[in-house]
């Protein structure tokens, strides 16, 4: 991707919204934290993220001084000088209270991510023979499991079964981008719709299910989730 971006004179932007602390194996000898690979990277501090604030927030990181200055301009009305907008900008500063909270929570991020990986490994083990497909991670990469997402061709029935057992799940995300009303004008003409369908995207949207996973999740609770899935698998 970096070579492609360079060839076309484009910036490579990493979407790290759900990947705080994850690592990418660049080669057999080099692994890098996500957020250090592209020209810019964007992190979300929404409260449910691995590193979350008390409200909305986010961060852009870059090693490029020119881009850093541009982002600083955009975050506060395009100001270089107070009350003078050199470029169209926004009010998107992270307030000091949110920043202070994030600094405290940052100390615990590695431990929380380690706990998430332990819980995910237990799910992997317990669900190996169940009716779901578990996440895969390329060798050498380090996942942080903001979500633990399985796939099932009986997703809706499985979700209903888990709900009946008092187990909350979620679907991330039920409507693919290309089917969102905001982007209908990009859709192909009716005569070409079937040929231009994003079949794998639509299949994934119909199958994905996020199971409970967070650092404070107890092993006993996780085992109960896995047992309920095994019970469902035995019934179909």
Could you tell me what each predicted segment is?
Residues 50, 54-59:
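Glycine-rich phosphate-binding loop of ATP-grasp-fold ATP-dependent ligases
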């Amino acid at each position: 991707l970096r070579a492609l971006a360079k060839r076309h004179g484009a910036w490579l932007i990493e979407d790290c919204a759900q990947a705080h602390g994850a690592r990418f194996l660049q080669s057999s000898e080099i692994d890098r934290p996500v957020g250090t690979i592209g020209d810019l990277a964007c992190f979300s501090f929404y409260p449910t993220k691995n590193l979350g604030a008390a409200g909305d927030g986010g961060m852009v990181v870059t090693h490029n001084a020119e881009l850093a200055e541009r982002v600083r301009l955009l975050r506060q009305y395009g100001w270089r000088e107070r009350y003078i907008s050199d470029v169209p900008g926004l009010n998107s500063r992270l307030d000091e209270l949110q920043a202070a909270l994030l600094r405290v929570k940052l100390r615990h991020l590695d431990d929380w991510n380690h706990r998430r990986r332990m819980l995910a490994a237990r799910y992997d083990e317990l669900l190996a023979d169940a009716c779901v497909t578990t996440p895969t991670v390329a060798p050498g990469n380090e996942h942080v499991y903001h979500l633990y997402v399985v796939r099932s061709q009986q997703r809706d029935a499985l979700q209903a079964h888990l709900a009946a057992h008092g187990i909350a799940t979620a679907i991330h995300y039920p409507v693919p981008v290309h089917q969102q009303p905001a982007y209908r004008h990009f859709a192909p003409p009716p005569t070409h719709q079937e040929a231009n369908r994003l079949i794998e995207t639509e299949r994934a949207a119909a199958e994905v299910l996020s199971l409970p996973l967070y650092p404070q999740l107890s092993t006993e609770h996780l085992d109960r989730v896995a047992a309920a899935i095994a019970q469902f698998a035995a019934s179909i």
